Curated annotation (Swiss-Prot):
The gene is STX19. This is Syntaxin-19. The keyword Cell membrane applies. It is found in: Cell membrane; Cytoplasm. It holds the Pfam family Syntaxin. GO terms for cellular component: presynaptic active zone membrane; SNARE complex; synaptic vesicle.
């Protein structure tokens, strides 16, 4: 019998060399494919102008929050005594500033919505600039909405204080009136309380009359402020309805992306598992046809 041990050893070495060469070639090919599928970051246009406008708008919202807080602190000092003209003048200045700032911020937020739609058309809804503008608008809009709610609650509380003070002063003077009567007089503008005939009839002092008149003026100013706030809240409600669908779409996109990533991870795991079980990658015998052919 012919001794073929040396031939077997030589054949085994050739198979090992062929297998190592095949593995290195496969890894190189896989690495090449992976590099082609690597994440390539988009070159987004520079958004310096948008960032500058957003920063400016954020500063305006912060200033509005400071003025609303200042207005609320002034209302805490509301007492039954006669208020000085300087305090009333200062309060009137603050309310005017709040109104001007709120209208400016509302217009700026509307302009930002237009910029978002423009960016969606030019750069696409998934571009970096579009996503930055959307997130910034949502954050600033919520902040602005909270500030206006606080301002509205402060005005409503002040209105109730003024009505309570007028009722108390009339009660002290001997003129009993219900809160509904005061509300009707306020809405209808029939303030016969301030006539000289009533002053003589109930023996009300001029100081008390002056105080009631002052509260009446404050109530009238509050009515005008509430009307302005109502217009702003109507515009805010329209913005909420318009942006609500966009927020829902963003949430659905994020959830679908999360599910897609999880599915991709599972597929990669299965791919690695099947790769290890590939019969062409494992040598069962040195004379395997698939290996010898290579």
């Amino acid at each position: 019998m012919k001794d073929r041990l040396q031939e077997l050893k030589q054949r085994t070495k050739e198979i090992e060399l062929s297998r190592d060469s095949h593995v290195s070639t496969t890894e190189t090919e896989e690495q090449g494919v992976f590099l082609q599928q690597a994440v390539i970051y988009e070159r987004e246009p520079v958004a310096e102008r948008h960032l500058h406008e957003i920063q400016k708008l954020q500063e305006s919202i912060n200033n509005l929050a400071d003025n609303v807080q200042k207005f609320g602190q002034q209302q805490k000092s509301l007492v039954a005594s006669m208020r000085r003209f300087s305090l009333l003048k200062r309060e009137s200045t603050v309310t005017k500033e709040v109104k001007i700032q709120a209208e400016y911020i509302n217009r700026s937020l509307n302009d930002l919505v237009k910029e978002v739609k423009k960016s969606e058309v030019e750069n696409g809804p998934s571009s970096v600039v579009t996503r930055i503008l959307k997130s910034q608008h949502a954050a600033m809009f919520c902040h602005f909405q909270q500030i206006m709610f606080i301002y509205n609650d402060t005005i409503a509380a002040k209105q109730e204080k003024c009505k309570t003070f007028i009722l108390r002063q009339l009660e002290v003077a001997g003129k009993e009136m219900s809160e509904e009567d005061v509300n009707d007089m306020l809405h209808q503008g029939k303030w016969e309380v301030f006539n000289e005939s009533l002053l003589t009839e109930i023996n009300i002092t001029k100081a008390q009359l002056s105080e009631i008149e002052q509260r009446h003026k404050e109530l009238v100013n509050l009515e005008n402020q509430i009307k302005d706030l109502r217009d702003l809240f109507i515009q805010l409600s329209l913005l909420v309805e318009e942006q609500g669908e966009s927020i829902n779409n963003i949430e659905m996109t994020v959830n679908s992306t999360k599910e897609y990533v999880n599915n991709t991870k599972e597929k990669f795991g299965l791919a690695v598992k099947y790769k290890k079980r590939n019969p062409c990658r494992v040598l069962c015998c040195w004379c395997c046809p698939c290996c010898s052919s290579k």
